[in-house]
Amino acid sequence: MCRTTKAVFEKTDVTPAQVTGISFCSQMQGMVLVDEYGRALRRPMSYMDQRASAEFKACQTHGPCVSGVNIGMLLRSLRATHAASTSVKDPLWKYKWVQAHEPEIFQEAHKWLDVKESLIARATSEFVMTRDSAYSTFLYDTRPGHEGWNEGLCQMYGVETRHLAKIIECTDVAGLLTEQAARELGLCPGTRVYGGGGDATLIGVGAGCTAVGSTHIYSGTSGWVGTVMDHQAVDLSAMIAGIVGAEKGKYNYFAEMETAGKCFEWVKDHLVLDEVNIYLSKTDVAESQETVYESLYDYMSDTVAQVASGSGGVIFTPWLHGNRCPFEDPAAAGIFFNIRLETGKAQMLRAVLEGICFHQRWMLECEERKTKTAPVIRFVGGGALSKVTCQMLADITGRTVETVENTKDVGAIGAAMLAAVGSGLFPDLAQAAAHVKVNGRYTPDAALKPVYDRNYRVFRQLYASNKKNYALLNRLKEG
C-alpha cells in the first residue's frame, strides 16, 4: 500500500500537499488484536478463518436451538442488533479462540480491531471503529437511543469491553496522519484520515447504489447481493440481515456467498492452465503478437461464449469454502453435477459461471421476501469485467444489469466518496453517487429463460440432496 501510494504521485500532477483527506476500504469481519502502539500481536485472522468451531459450539449450541444457536441467546441478539452470529467465521469466535488458545496474547491485547481499523491505528495512533465494522462483531446495539456497544451481549459472550474501540461515523475524521505514517505513505503529516468503511459497505456506495431500493450484485473473491433499506430487517431462514450502512438511518439488506470469483480462479488453475501446459505457472497467454487475448481470463470468457447456454446440462455449485446464504454451512462444497462422456472442459468452465449466477439469483429471490429489489441491478467487481458474465447474469436473473467504470475499484471509489462528504465537498452520498458513470447495460434474453429455469431448479435442490454427505465428509476435518 505504501509503495502504491507513492507510485500514484509519479503518474499524476497532483502533489501530496493537495491531498485533503484519505480513507480506507478493506475486507470485513477480520480480527486484529493490537497493543497500545497499534502493533499486531499475532497474525490477523481473515473473514474466511474457520478454526473456532469448538468455541462457537461451546458457547451457543446448547439447549433448544434455532438456526444452530441457543434460542435464548438468539433472541437477545436479535432484540439488540436485528442479527445474530450464526457462523463460525464471525470475528467474535476468532476473538474467543485467541482467548482460549493464546491467553498471553489475549491479556496483552489493547484493542480488538478489524482490518481497516488496524490501518487507521497505524496511520493515526487512534483506536476507533466505524459503525459498520462495529456492527459486524454482533455486539453493536442498533436500537434508537441505545446505539453503541451492548454490555449485555458482551457479558453473554464473554467479551472484555476494554478491548472495544470508540465508535465513529464513516465520514468522521478518525485522526490525523502521523509523521511516521506520512513518511511511509509519501503523504503530508496532519492529513485528515476519515473513518472509511468495509467492502460490504463501500462497494455498493462506489457502485452508485445509495438510494433506498437500489440493488447491487458484487462478484469478486466472494460475492453478495445488497439492497439499500431505510429500516432493519432479518430473515433467519435465509441468513440475510440488514447491516449498518455508511449513512446513519440506511441499511444494506445483505445476502452473501463465500466464493464467487474465487471459483473462476480455481477453475483457471485446475482446469485451464494445465490444458495449455502452463499449470499454475502463468496467468497471461499473450506471449506472441498473434494472439488476440490480453489475458487468460479473456481467453476463458471467449471460450465460455462459444458454449451453448445451459452448459449441456452440467451444473456447478460455487461453495468452495462453505456458504452463508441462503444456508449457513461451512461443510458445503463444490459439485460438478451431470457430467457425461460428451462433457468437455469448456462446458465445465461455463457451468462455473452459470453456477455463480444461479446462486446470485437465489440470494436475490430470498431478498424479495422482505424487501423490493431493484428492476435494474448494478453489477460490480472483477466478474463484471466480462461481458459474457454480465449478459449471463441478466439472462439468469431476468433483470437488466448495468456496469460502471472502474468496476474493480468501486470499494476505493466508495472510500473516496466518504472522504469527499466528510470534507464538505459533497453534502451527502447521494450527490457524490451522481458522479458514478454507467458504461454498460445488458437486458435479459427471454429465449434463454426455459433452459436456465430448468437448470436453476436442479441447482437449488443440490444442497438439500447432499447436506448429510457434506457433513460426513467435511465436518470430520474440523476436529
List PLM regions with ranges.
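Glycine/Thr-rich phosphate-binding loops that ligate phosphate moieties of nucleotide
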Residues: R3, P16, T20-H62, E104, ...
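Glycine-rich phosphate-binding/catalytic subdomain of phosphoryl-transfer
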Residues: R3-T291
